[in-house]
Amino acid sequence: MSKRRVAADLPSGTNSSMPVQRHRVSSLRGTHSPSSLDSPPASRTSAVGSLVRAPGVYVGVAPSGGIGGLGARVTRRALGISSVFLQGLRSSGLANVPAPGPERDHTTVEDLGGCLVEYMTKVHALEQVSQELETQLRAHLESKAKSSGGWDALRASWASSYQQVGEAVLENARLLLQMETIQAGADDFKERYENEQPFRKAAEEEVSSLYKVIDEANLTKTDLEHQIESLKEELGFLSRSYEEDVKVLYKQLAGSELEQADVPMGTGLDDVLETIRVQWERDVEKNRAEAGALLQAKQQTEVVHVSQTQEEKLAAALSVELHDTSRQVQSLQAETESLRALKRGLENSLHDAQHWHDMELQNLGAVVGRLEAELAEIRSETEQQQQERAHLLACKSQLQKDVASYHALLDREENN
């Protein structure tokens, strides 16, 4: 008895020799790639690799020849679906669903929802028809089980191969979606980093301008300190000269009196007259000297008074100037303290900004490094999955050749 295999359309490499297409979708999880289908409820494992069972891939057998000539034509009649409906199924299948991307809009989502609703309706109809066909196929297989003892092992091998192919397709779609998500995250971090660059440059320029202001304030402070030192030296010189002038004036006013010894008087008239004349001349000279001294002292007193008045005026002016200078010094000291406080605040702000920028750069570098490592890992996994997929496709083509040869042998046996 000849047996033919009825399998669902695979996501890639569909063979036209498989007459019946059968899909089963239980749920839609998140975003699917155009070639991915949801897996059935029961979890199944494969003997080859560690892949998950391919969703929507089922293997059945349909008799060819024999009763009613079951085959492609009989299957189509059993399905009760016109060629137009099947063509619509092929044109509106998952292969035509556009691949989602990070920039899909609301219209694309609505179109995808409509396509998925239409597809689900057709899938439910196909499931009902497939259940009827499966019942017929199982009844026919049970009647032919004795003559086809080796068919179970072959069917298990085919199921395993199709399962591995479907699992590889699903894993590839999942990895592609994960790569797109990671790439979108990396682009977002890169955009944030580029947006932060102008703020960082503006902060650096502001800090540079503040450094210039601080340097100018330091220069002004140094100049004012030099001026204060020169004013202090001039004030000390004026104080010393004033003290010296006062001491000289005191020395001039404090004159010393000369002590003169008495001359003994003679006993004669001439001696008496001579003594009187000498005393009179001495008194005259003394009075003249006293008058000259008094006049000179008066003149010196007037000069000293005038000089004292000028010195007092100069001292008052110097005291006023000293008061103004001290007030300027105090204001400059207060301004210097405020500039120092401003400098400390700016230095703290600069330190905080630099620390924050360093932390941001470190975080971004760590994120970029992690994303690059994940991207490299995903690329390696993708390459491995592609290699496994190519290997499975080769196995599939080999199995299809074996199935074709088995079909030929079964046809010859049936004809014989």
From Swiss-Prot:
How is expression of this protein distributed across tissues? Detected in retina lens fiber cells (at protein level). Also expressed in the lens epithelium, abundantly expressed in the anterior and anterolateral epithelium, less frequently expressed nearer the lens coronal equator (at protein level).
Compartments it resides in: Cell membrane; Cytoplasm; Cytoplasm, Cytoskeleton; Cytoplasm, Cell cortex
Q: Where is this region: Tail?
A: 397-416
Lipid bilayer topology: Peripheral membrane protein
This protein's major location comes to membrane
List residues of the IF rod domain. Answer: 105-416
Task: Tell me which SMART domains the record gives.
Answer: Filament
- Does the record carry Cytoplasm as a key word? yes
Gene Ontology cellular component annotations, sorted alphabetically: cell cortex; cytoplasm; intermediate filament; plasma membrane
Q: Where is this region: Disordered?
A: 1-48
Instruction: Write the record's keywords in alphabetical order, separated by commas.
Output: Acetylation, Cell membrane, Coiled coil, Cytoplasm, Cytoskeleton, Eye lens protein, Intermediate filament, Membrane, Phosphoprotein, Repeat, Sensory transduction, Vision
The record's annotation in InterPro entries points to:
IF_rod_dom (IPR039008), Keratin_I (IPR002957)
Q: Which residues form a coiled coil?
A: 116-146, 170-249, 308-402
What residue spans carry the region label Head? 2-115
Phenotypic consequence of gene deletion: No overall change in lens fiber cell organization, regularity of hexagonal profiles, or positioning of cell nuclei. Opacification of the retinal lens is evident at 1 month of age, with progressive loss of clarity to 10 months of age. Reduced abundance and loss of distinction of intermediate filaments in retinal lens fiber cells. Decreased protein abundance of BFSP1 in the retinal lens. Complete loss of beaded filament structures in lens epithelial cells. BFSP2 and VIM double knockout mice show a complete loss of the cytoplasmic cytoskeleton in retinal lens fiber cells.
Q: How does it assemble?
A: Part of a complex required for lens intermediate filament formation composed of BFSP1, BFSP2 and CRYAA. Found in a complex composed of PPL (via C-terminal linker domain), BFSP1 and BFSP2 in the retinal lens. Within the complex interacts with PPL (via C-terminal linker domain) and with BFSP1. Identified in a complex that contains VIM, EZR, AHNAK, BFSP1, BFSP2, ANK2, PLEC, PRX and spectrin. Interacts with LGSN. Interacts with VIM.
Job of this protein = Required for the correct formation of lens intermediate filaments as part of a complex composed of BFSP1, BFSP2 and CRYAA. Plays a role in maintenance of retinal lens optical clarity.
By what name is this protein known? Phakinin
- Source species of the chain: Mus musculus
Gene of this entry: Bfsp2
